[in-house]
Amino acid sequence: MDIRLDDIGRQFPPHWDEAQAARGKTAFFKALALEAHRFYGGKIQILPRAPLPGFQWFNAWYTPGVSAVSTGIRDNPDESFELSWRGNVVAVVSDSTRVLGDGDVSPPGGLGVMEGKAFLMKVLGGVDAVPICMDSRDAAGRHDPEILIDFVRRLTPSFGAVNLEDISQPNCFRVLDALRESCDVPVWHDDAQGTGCVTLAGLLNALKVAGKELAQ
């Protein structure tokens, strides 16, 4: 089999119909995912962006030199987007209550999907992303959207944007609305807004093909 898996369809018996082949691919990729994730220990890591030409550079990247960065951002908070990773990093945040077709998978259970979203952002868009799965349950064990809202608000000084992911309804809408009102960085809910964008794009293209206006 080609390591790129381009020939995956040819690995199944030729008498399989389309539905059988689809189920076979799903089973194959689930088994592969477990082995590959175990082998690599997840999909992402953090690597230094800046070089270290010599030992003395530690004095610039860390103390005492970095004090100028800290006070510079203190005096002008917008400098955080130029002097730190904030200008190119997104927090991918979930409480893991509605993960794909698996539902509530527990907070750490969502890490595979959040890592996957971070992986896509980096490979396809060149944007760094940090997967964060948090526990939004209150003392009674109920998922409280206010806990998630407060958590994300407190994270935003470290990130340039927030991508909300796999949060169950109706909490997802409440969380998105509250954070968009109160955060000073863009907040996006992939499952709601992403799906909406794709649906709208499909509708607009269909109207072009049909030669009709949206009002019709």
Language-model segments: which ranges?
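A glycine-rich, Thr/Ser-enriched phosphate-binding loop motif common to dinucleotide/cofactor-binding enzymes
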Residues: 188-205
